């Protein structure tokens, strides 16, 4: 019986590469000349920490990071943009947590979308992934296309197509 898994994971090395390219771009840009800007990645907690001098530069840096992540194949939905920036003296700091895994609410939403589609497939939640099984590979490919067209709120990857 053919099946595939739906996961939401970010490769830490790819994320690190994207941040290195973003750091390099920031050091060469004219509008960031002589600015005290830092981008750090806490690999254990999966948090990107951005520090700079004002909120205008902060927005520009976040845009650069998102652009570089997209060029590396990482979806912008993998970042939790809900945490606001905070100031400490003349510097502005912001933490961007990286989401790994599919939360319960998103799992329910994905399973509901799959069941409402009317395809002859069965989704099953397994910890932080969803396994979808069906009789035909064509049905599974239709489900993948359906989920790519819908906005679920998390970055989805489809792995282990058997």
From Swiss-Prot:
InterPro entries named in the record: DUF520, UPF0234-like_C, UPF0234_N, YajQ-like_sf
Cellular component terms (Gene Ontology): cytosol
Keyword match Ribonucleoprotein: no
Keywords: Nucleotide-binding
SUPFAM superfamilies reported in the protein's UniProt record: YajQ-like (SSF89963)
Keyword Chaperone: no
Span of the signal peptide: none
Gene Ontology MF term list: nucleotide binding
Entries under HAMAP family matching the protein: YajQ
Record's function text: Nucleotide-binding protein.
Family note: Belongs to the YajQ family.
Name assigned to this protein: Nucleotide-binding protein CHU_2278
Lineage, highest ranks first: Bacteria, Pseudomonadati, Bacteroidota, Cytophagia, Cytophagales
């Amino acid at each position: 019986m053919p099946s595939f898994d739906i996961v939401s994971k970010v490769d830490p090395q790819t994320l690190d590469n994207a941040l290195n390219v973003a750091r390099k771009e920031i050091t060469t840009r004219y509008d960031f000349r002589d600015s005290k800007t830092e981008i750090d990645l806490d690999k254990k907690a999966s948090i990107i920490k951005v520090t700079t001098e004002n909120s205008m530069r902060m927005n520009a840096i976040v845009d650069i990071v998102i652009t570089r992540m997209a060029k590396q194949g990482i979806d912008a939905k993998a970042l939790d943009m809900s945490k606001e920036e905070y100031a400490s003296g003349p510097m502005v700091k912001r933490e961007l947590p990286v989401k790994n895994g599919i939360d319960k609410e998103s799992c329910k939403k994905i399973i509901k979308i799959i069941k409402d589609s009317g395809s002859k497939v069965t989704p099953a939640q397994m910890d932080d992934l969803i396994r979808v099984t069906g009789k035909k590979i064509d049905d599974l490919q239709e489900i993948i296309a359906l989920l790519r067209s819908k906005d679920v709120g998390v970055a989805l990857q489809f792995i282990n197509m058997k």
